[in-house]
Swiss-Prot record:
GO annotation, biological process: fungal-type cell wall organization; GPI anchor biosynthetic process; protein mannosylation
Name used for this protein in its record: GPI mannosyltransferase 2
Record's bilayer topology term: Multi-pass membrane protein
Subunit structure, interactors included: Part of the GPI mannosyltransferase 2 complex composed of GPI18 and PGA1.
Main location: endoplasmic reticulum
Matches recorded under InterPro entries: PIG-V/Gpi18
Role summary: Mannosyltransferase involved in glycosylphosphatidylinositol-anchor biosynthesis. Responsible for the transfer of the second mannose to the glycosylphosphatidylinositol during GPI precursor assembly.
Family as reported in the entry's similarity comment: Belongs to the PIGV family.
UniProt-listed Enzyme Commission number(s): 2.4.1.-
UniProt pathway annotation: Glycolipid biosynthesis; glycosylphosphatidylinositol-anchor biosynthesis
Length: 433
């Protein structure tokens, strides 16, 4: 099964990179050429065959900021707004770059290789996570394997498309998110009577591995902070069942450590780096002697430089961006309904909460089209699609789909259209971002 998934992954990626190669070399935005002229000493290197027809095209949108941070002397951003781009990802890529090779193309090739390895490993981890979720007994084991295979294939066919051909930070969070969810799933137990519990022997995988993975995923991508809802859910369930000591030693401890790490990254480090000289957000301290401000540096950057905030994106000129996100909005909402109302599963209850929270936050507070790029760190919609595809595998049923199967069919057709289109748009430095 793993060999089959590997072959599919190689095939999908080869097609995408071929599309990048075939995309016209003239990009819509000039950021790439300006950056290359700044960082490359030799014009001949920029215009060499493979760089001109392939590698330069991968430096689009956020990749420009990532490669700039990765190739800087100390790995630190030059300007304030560049702190919005994961420092953890920058640090991780720099670990694999030879110290005596300062070529931007060497860094790019290493980053792309790491991107693909993490993307592939995330799909493999997701396969085993899916098997764990859906094989509650021996009779379901074959069904679980089928669901797991389709889920991983759908993950490889993500709507993030062209973004993941470059050096974006998402695959690092995908990997940590899936390992963290898998570790938690292996730790909890839900007996027949529904008494949620966590055995003491699973303290390490729950309170360390899951906590560490969720924390690293969140430090890398801020949307992954929603994974902390797992700890809130478990805390509520253990408290309801009067397992107070376990509630403290498992979810409360894990959640507190995760919160502390985020507090350190989002508030303490920026305050020590920029304040009080910076002014503006630095002056919004809740208390005069404490580093916690009303607005974190990341929130300030998102609001000040990219116009992120409640309903700020709800303008007529952004209607096309909402339309780009509609397929994923629909599939995420319907997957949360499917696993809470139609085929309710206690094991997926917390993930349903997280999925709904993601949709609300992105639709009302963020640039809504990024949902296409970030949604895959949550596998609920992939499980919904895979489950429906397995249950409607009869060709006659697919010819005349009914109800939510029409949604599934539409989404698959949309992916077949969107993935190659978005890959080409990305390589040409064209919207959507």
């Amino acid at each position: 099964m793993i060999v089959g998934l590997t072959l599919y992954f190689v095939l999908f990626r080869s097609i995408q990179y071929l599309l990048v190669f075939l995309t016209p070399i003239r990009q819509f935005d000039t950021s790439t050429s300006l950056l290359l002229n700044e960082l490359c000493s030799s014009p001949s290197e920029i215009n060499s065959y493979w760089n001109k027809y392939f590698w330069n095209k991968l430096l689009s949108w956020d990749s420009v900021f990532f490669i700039k941070n990765i190739t800087s002397k100390n790995g630190k951003p030059q300007f304030e707004h560049e702190y919005a781009f994961s420092q953890l990802w920058t640090f991780f890529v720099r670990l694999f770059i030879k110290s005596n090779n300062d070529s931007i193309y060497h860094a790019l090739r290493v980053g792309v290789a790491i991107e693909n390895v993490l993307f592939y490993l995330s799909g493999i981890v997701l396969y085993f996570l899916t098997k764990k979720i859906f094989s509650q007994n021996i009779r379901q084991s074959q069904f679980a394997r089928t669901i797991a295979k389709k889920t991983s294939l759908l993950f490889f066919l993500t709507s993030a498309a062209g973004f993941l051909t470059s050096i974006y930070s998402e695959p690092l969070s995908f990997f940590f998110a899936f390992v963290g969810i898998w570790s938690r799933e292996c730790s909890i137990s839900v007996p027949v009577l529904g008494q949620f519990d966590i055995s003491w022997r699973y303290w390490f995988p729950y309170s360390f591995i899951s906590m560490a993975c969720f924390t690293l995923a969140s430090l890398n991508r801020s949307n992954c902070v929603l994974l902390g809802i797992y700890f809130i859910f478990d805390l509520i369930e253990l408290t309801k069942n009067r397992k107070f000591v376990k509630a403290i030693c498992f979810p409360l401890l894990s959640g507190s450590l995760m919160f502390s790490a985020l507090l350190y990254q989002q508030y303490y480090l920026p305050y020590k780096t920029f304040c009080p000289q910076r002014g503006e957000w630095c002056k919004s301290q809740l208390f005069s002697s404490i580093f916690i401000t009303k607005t974190s540096l990341y929130s300030y950057i998102q609001s000040h430089y990219w116009g992120v905030g409640l309903l700020k994106y709800w303008t007529p000129n952004n209607i096309p961006n909402f339309l780009f996100a509609v397929p994923n909005i629909i599939i995420l909402i319907y997957s949360s309904i499917y696993f809470s109302k139609i085929y309710p599963s206690y094991n997926l209850k917390a993930l349903v909460w997280i999925t709904r929270a993601l949709v609300v936050i992105v639709c009302f507070f963020a640039h809504v089209q990024i949902l296409n790029r970030i949604a895959s760190f949550l596998p609920l919609h992939l499980w919904y699609l895979a489950d429906r595809l397995v249950k409607t595998s009869d060709p006659k049923k697919m010819e005349n789909p009914k109800g939510d199967d029409k949604i599934v069919k539409f989404y698959i057709y949309w992916l077949a259209f969107w993935i190659p289109l978005q890959t080409i748009l990305f390589a040409a430095f064209l919207p959507p971002a």
